[in-house]
C-alpha cells in the first residue's frame, strides 16, 4: 500500500512540474468558433465584441455579445460584421484592439 501511495505522490509531483503544468496562463483554453452566423444581428441587440485570432482555432472570427449575454460568432470578412464592429467602436468610449 505504501508503494502505491508513494507512486501516486510521485506522479502528482511530476505532473505539476511538467512543461504543461508550468505553462501558466498560456495554457488557458482559447474560445474558438466553429459555426458562424449567417444573418445580420440587429445593432440594437449588440453590446460588445471580441476578435478571435488565435492560431489554436481553425478560423478567425468575431464574437458578438448581445444585451441578453449571448455570444454569437461571425465571419470578420463579411461587410455586416465589419459595419457592426465599427458601430460598437463608435458607441464605446474605449477602442477595441
Swiss-Prot record:
Belongs to the intercrine beta (chemokine CC) family. Its main location: secreted. It is found in: Secreted. Keywords: Chemotaxis, Cytokine, Disulfide bond, Glycoprotein, Inflammatory response, Secreted, Signal. Glycans are attached at residue 94. Induction: Induced by TNF, IL1A/interleukin-1 alpha and IFNG/IFN-gamma. One of its GO terms (molecular function) is chemokine activity. In response to the presence of allergens, this protein directly promotes the accumulation of eosinophils, a prominent feature of allergic inflammatory reactions. Binds to CCR3. One of its GO terms (cellular component) is extracellular region. GO terms for biological process: actin filament organization; antimicrobial humoral immune response mediated by antimicrobial peptide; branching involved in mammary gland duct morphogenesis; cell adhesion; chemokine-mediated signaling pathway; chemotaxis; chronic inflammatory response; cytoskeleton organization. The keyword Protein transport does not apply. Disulfide bonds join 32-57, 33-73. The keyword Protein transport does not apply. Residues 1-23 form the signal peptide. This is Eotaxin. SMART domains: SCY. O-linked glycan consists of a Gal-GalNAc disaccharide which is modified with up to 2 sialic acid residues.
